[in-house]
């Protein structure tokens, strides 16, 4: 999806989305009032079940309507791909916690994704996110797509790792439109 998004292959993205809509995943979960987000999340909920990763969500109603299918796909699939990859490396209990809510005092929508992470994902020398992907040339495309979506909607993204308790935190804030 990321490659299709970057090359702006709208017809191929549309075909992919239509195939998603026809999959058996569509009846598995309803964690939000956004049908398309449910389709995306159902895949990750199943992946987490298969890998014994606890997956928790708290998604408030009426949010994310400003994201089109392409942006929603780029944002959530890339963040969740990374979260599942990281959580699956844990030797003990692993988890992913996704929360989406509106913060009226800040006039923004907050996406909070916290996942277990066995060690710091940051390169000790450069301070940038590192990868364990076999094809190092593909490193960074997903997060660049996420950053593109965040920037396109005048949002902010923060990433941080807690060395003591071992979770990796991703927070994305989108201002009210």
Q: Where are the regions that the model predicts?
A:
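Hydrophobic residues in the alpha-helical elements that line and stabilize the ATP-binding pocket
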Residues: 79, 83
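A short, flexible helix-to-loop-to-beta junction within the catalytic ATP-binding CA
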Residues: 84-92
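Short beta-strand/loop element within the Bergerat-fold HATPase_c
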Residues: 93-107
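Conserved short strand/loop->alpha-helix "switch" segment adjacent to the catalytic nucleotide/phosphoryl-transfer site
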Residues: 29, 54-75
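Glycine-rich/acidic phosphate-handling loop/turn and adjacent ATP-lid/helix
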Residues: 107-140
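Short beta-to-alpha transition helix within the HATPase_c
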Residues: 15-22, 33-51
């Amino acid at each position: 999806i990321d490659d299709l998004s970057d090359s702006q292959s709208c017809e191929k993205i549309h075909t992919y989305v239509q195939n998603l809509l026809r999959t058996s995943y569509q009846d598995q979960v309803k964690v939000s009032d956004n049908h398309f987000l449910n389709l995306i999340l159902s895949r990750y909920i199943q992946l987490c079940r298969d890998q014994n990763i606890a997956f928790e969500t708290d998604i408030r109603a009426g949010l994310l309507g400003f994201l089109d299918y392409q942006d929603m796909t780029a944002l959530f699939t890339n963040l969740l791909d990374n979260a599942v990859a990281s959580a699956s490396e844990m030797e003990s209990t692993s988890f992913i916690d996704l929360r989406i809510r509106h913060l009226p005092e800040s006039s923004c929508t907050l996406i909070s994704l916290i996942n277990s992470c066995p060690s710091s994902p940051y390169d000790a020398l450069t301070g940038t996110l590192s990868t364990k992907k076999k094809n190092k040339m593909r490193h960074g495309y997903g997060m660049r797509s996420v950053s593109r979506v965040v920037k396109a909607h005048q949002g902010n993204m923060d990433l941080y790792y807690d060395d003591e308790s071992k979770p990796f935190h991703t927070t994305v804030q989108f201002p009210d439109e």
